[in-house]
Amino acid sequence: MSSILLLTSSPRAESLSTPIAVELAEKLKNQNPGSFLVRRDLAASPLPHIDDLFTGAIRKPAEARTAEEVAAVKTSDELVNELFAADTIVISTGLINFNIYSSLKTWIDNVARAGLTFKYTESGPVGLLTGKKVYVVLTSGGVYSQGPAAPLNHAVPYLKSVFGFLGITDIETIYVEGLAFGPEAAEKAIDAAKMRVQEIALAA
């Protein structure tokens, strides 16, 4: 039995990253009978941005927090629990201004918590979320996986850095790119992504 956490972040009704990520998550679930699938639509149900109350609360032991502080970290605690429970995390995002959607960044801000998902030691920080797999479905109008525009792709390096900091190093990006290069190029990119989704599901 496994648990899959699906995070979709596109605000676009005609998003291409969302259906491909959903398809991957559903196929992984179907390949493993009894698996659980938890979905967070970060665009439709935006998470609270961290604020002064939140940052003060997470620096205290849980038993020392006021009722107001407990309420301030309640959603974050739920997100952290979902992340710990997941064996596989499927993420969808478009490349917006060379990075991820802000809704996904807010999720990261809520789950990257010292003492919970990582800790500091004498030899440096240690991630506490080990043994997990992350799939990132990344859409873009241009081509950013390689070529002259690749240095502008800050999304993938950022996600690898932050998840690596939390202890997750097994990360695969499924690029759906060149979507602005005409219908034929878009269709080719989508077909390639769906083929990779099928390969991943069959190997699960």
UniProtKB/Swiss-Prot annotation:
Catalytic activity: 2 a quinone + NADH + H(+) = 2 a 1,4-benzosemiquinone + NAD(+); N,N-dimethyl-1,4-phenylenediamine + anthranilate + 2 NAD(+) = 2-(4-dimethylaminophenyl)diazenylbenzoate + 2 NADH + 2 H(+)
Residues at which FMN binds: 10, 15-17, 139-142
InterPro entries: Flavodoxin_fold (IPR003680), Flavoprotein-like_sf (IPR029039), FMN-dep_NADH:Q_OxRdtase_AzoR1 (IPR050104), NADH:quinone_OxRdtase_FMN_depd (IPR023048)
Matching SUPFAM superfamilies: Flavoproteins (SSF52218)
Cofactor binding note of this UniProt entry: Binds 1 FMN per subunit.
Gene Ontology MF annotations: electron transfer activity; FMN binding; oxidoreductase activity, acting on NAD(P)H as acceptor; oxidoreductase activity, acting on NAD(P)H, quinone or similar compound as acceptor
Cited function: Quinone reductase that provides resistance to thiol-specific stress caused by electrophilic quinones. Also exhibits azoreductase activity. Catalyzes the reductive cleavage of the azo bond in aromatic azo compounds to the corresponding amines.
Name of the protein: FMN-dependent NADH:quinone oxidoreductase
Complexes and interactors: Homodimer.
Keywords per UniProt: Flavoprotein, FMN, NAD, Oxidoreductase
A Pfam family assignment: Flavodoxin_2
Entry similarity comment: Belongs to the azoreductase type 1 family.
Cofactors demanded by this protein: FMN
Natural source organism: Rhizobium leguminosarum bv. trifolii (strain WSM2304)
Protein EC: 1.6.5.-, 1.7.1.17
